[in-house]
């Protein structure tokens, strides 16, 4: 055999031998024929970082491996089982993961398609996520008694469809006020109102946010006229006069009363546009022969409250189980209504609220007892001069 030469060259998977001028090809997996493969070894495992709660994104490192030059693929596991489609280096936690532990499985591959696999340690069990307020709730509407306010729930991330409302008066929950709108009540007068929105979404903790408070709630309409009056008594008075004065003024100030017609009332020491009288029953007829010792009356500038009725209401009122305080509201509103120019009204229909200008002390003809003016009764005298009783009623006597 003649002298020969041997050359070795690595070209991908091909090793060429030349002996005595002859070419003999050979295929070897990844290395020259006879050479051993270098094993893939995980030196340190993958590490998952991020908050383990719904809606958050967790990420994994590939870990440390030998040899160098490896490529990596990822798969996320829920309690050790693969999560369909979760094959990125990061993973956004879903509602289905709630209560489960997550881990990341990393597969390393070399140039010869040799692989190695390592898995991170588990996260703690996934907790419920938190809802973020992108735009706080807001309130629209006029902050006046008997006006309706409406709530906008604001914007949340992620988006929510389930929201609940609780209206608050000066920070305290208003009983039963749990809808998206709220009709301002007499109790709201002078108070600031807001609404608290609670947002809910599956897999998330409830989120709460409050709207900016309204300004102090005002009366239904602006003050159009302030009327002054003073208080007198007639006959033997056994009722507490200070209480009478206080409760009468409370009736005048109440948002449900004549104040909703734009009328304000101010008590003065003497004089004024009219006189509110607390009279012993036997004294009432002295104002006019038309007046009765049984009922209250209005004669000219005198708005006369019968002391017996003030202390005990009327048989019809008591038979209906209504309160003495409501009767007092009614009788002051009724007699003052005469001074304002209102006459008597009848029942508008069975089961409906009685007008305050109906003679409710005597009965209601099927209407419901009512101490406050109806909306239809809240009118001002055409002259607009409400500092005194309209002239065409000055001489009239009303018995109630």
Role assignments for model-derived ranges:
Residues 1-21:
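N-terminal export and membrane-targeting signals
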Residues 17, 21-221:
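Ser/Thr/Pro/Gly-rich low-complexity disordered regions
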Residues 97-99, 188, 222-224, 268-271, ...:
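Extracellular/periplasmic catalytic domains that process cell-envelope and extracellular macromolecules
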Residues 220-244:
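Fold-level signature of zinc-dependent metallopeptidase catalytic domains
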Residues 243-330:
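Metzincin-family zinc-dependent endopeptidase catalytic domain
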Residues 250-259, 339, 343, 360-363:
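Structured segments of extracytoplasmic/periplasmic soluble domains
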Residues 293-295, 299, 303-304, 311-313, ...:
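Metalloprotease/metallohydrolase-associated module, dominated by Zn2+-dependent proteases
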Residues 325-343:
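Active-site recognition of the HExxH zinc-binding catalytic motif
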């Amino acid at each position: 055999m003649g002298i020969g030469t041997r050359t070795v060259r690595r070209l991908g998977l091909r090793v060429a031998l030349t002996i005595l001028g002859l070419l003999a090809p050979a295929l070897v997996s990844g290395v020259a024929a006879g050479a051993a493969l270098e094993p893939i070894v995980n030196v340190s495992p993958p590490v998952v970082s991020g908050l383990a709660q719904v809606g958050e994104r967790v990420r994994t490192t590939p870990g440390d491996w030998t040899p160098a030059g490896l490529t990596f693929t990822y798969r996320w596991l829920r309690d050790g089982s693969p999560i369909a489609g979760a094959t990125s280096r990061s993973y956004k936690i879903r509602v289905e993961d709630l209560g489960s532990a997550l881990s990341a499985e990393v597969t390393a591959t070399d140039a010869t398609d040799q692989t190695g696999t390592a898995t991170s340690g588990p996260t703690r069990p996934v907790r419920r996520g938190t809802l973020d307020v992108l735009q706080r709730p807001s309130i629209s509407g006029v902050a006046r008694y008997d006006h309706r306010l409406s709530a906008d729930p604001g914007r949340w991330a992620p988006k929510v469809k389930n929201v609940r409302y609780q209206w608050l008066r000066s920070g305290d929950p208003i009983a039963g006020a749990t809808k998206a709108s709220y009709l301002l009540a007499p109790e709201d007068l002078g108070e600031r109102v807001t609404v608290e929105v609670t947002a809910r979404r599956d897999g998330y903790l409830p989120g709460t946010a409050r709207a900016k408070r309204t300004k102090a709630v005002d009366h239904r309409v602006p003050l159009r006229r302030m009327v002054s009056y003073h208080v007198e008594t007639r006959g033997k008075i056994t009722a507490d006069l200070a209480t009478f004065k206080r409760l009468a003024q409370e009736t005048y100030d109440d948002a449900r009363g004549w104040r909703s017609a734009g009328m304000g009332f101010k008590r003065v020491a003497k004089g004024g546009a009219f006189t509110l009288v607390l009279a012993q029953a036997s004294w009432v007829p002295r104002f006019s022969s038309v007046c009765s010792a049984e009922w209250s009356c209005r004669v000219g500038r005198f708005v006369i409250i019968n002391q017996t009725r003030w202390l005990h209401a009327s048989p019809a009122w008591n038979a209906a189980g209504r309160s003495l305080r409501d009767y007092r509201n009614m009788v002051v509103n009724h007699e003052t209504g005469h001074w304002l120019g209102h006459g008597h009204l009848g029942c508008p229909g069975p089961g409906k609220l009685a007008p305050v200008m109906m003679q409710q002390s005597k009965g209601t003809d099927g209407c419901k007892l009512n101490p406050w003016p109806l909306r239809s009764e809240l009118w001002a005298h055409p002259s607009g001069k409400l500092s005194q009783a309209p002239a065409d009623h000055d001489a009239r006597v009303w018995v109630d």
